[in-house]
């Protein structure tokens, strides 16, 4: 295998791990770093493919759980669910493009039992342009490896605080 293919497979795997439901690692530094090494399109496509696989896993795991919980409770759709139902594809795609956290919108898709194909398509439609932009930024702005490490550590702080911070009873 070529170094480029190995790099794409590594980015695919990392993108999967950084986008699966309860991910604890940031994806931005990896995409920025891979851009100049793998090329803009190769980076964006590998990262998007990993994201879509993570979306399939999330959907397969969480939609049945959420459906069972809602059936037990007998809860009517709330205001946010009704708002989401107006344009779910656009909302998911737009939230995937922005730097806003994606998980609240994913949760809305799960509670709405949004179909798998559309869900994955919406995430790909939002994430591909984001990854293209991040990969391009990695090519356009030559950043030293130490800065990528610092960015990764900085983005890990919220996760570390959640995992290892003080517990409130």
What are these regions (language model features)?
Residues 14, 18-19, 126:
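Hydrophobic transmembrane alpha-helices of secondary-active solute transporters
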Residues 30-35:
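Hydrophobic transmembrane alpha-helices of multi-pass, membrane-embedded glycosylation machinery
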Residues 17-28, 95-103:
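Short helix-coil transition sites and intra-membrane helix breaks within transmembrane domains
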Residues 1-13, 36-119, 128-131, 136-169:
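Membrane-interfacial helix-loop-helix
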């Amino acid at each position: 295998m070529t170094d480029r293919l190995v790099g794409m497979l590594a980015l695919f795997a990392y993108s999967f791990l950084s986008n699966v439901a309860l991910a604890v690692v940031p994806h931005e530094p990896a995409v920025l770093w891979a851009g100049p090494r793998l090329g803009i399109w190769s980076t964006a496509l590998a990262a998007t493919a990993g994201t879509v696989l993570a979306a399939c896993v999330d959907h397969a795991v969480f939609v049945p759980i959420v459906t069972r919980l809602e059936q037990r409770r007998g809860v009517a759709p709330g205001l946010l669910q009704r708002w989401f139902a107006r344009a779910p594809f656009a909302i998911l795609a737009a939230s995937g493009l922005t730097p806003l956290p994606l998980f609240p919108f994913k949760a809305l898709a799960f509670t709405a039992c949004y179909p798998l194909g559309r869900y994955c398509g919406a995430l790909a439609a939002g994430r591909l342009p984001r990854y293209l932009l991040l990969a391009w930024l990695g090519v356009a702005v030559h950043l030293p490896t130490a800065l990528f490490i610092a960015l990764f550590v900085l983005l890990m702080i919220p996760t570390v605080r959640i995992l290892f911070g003080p517990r409130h009873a």
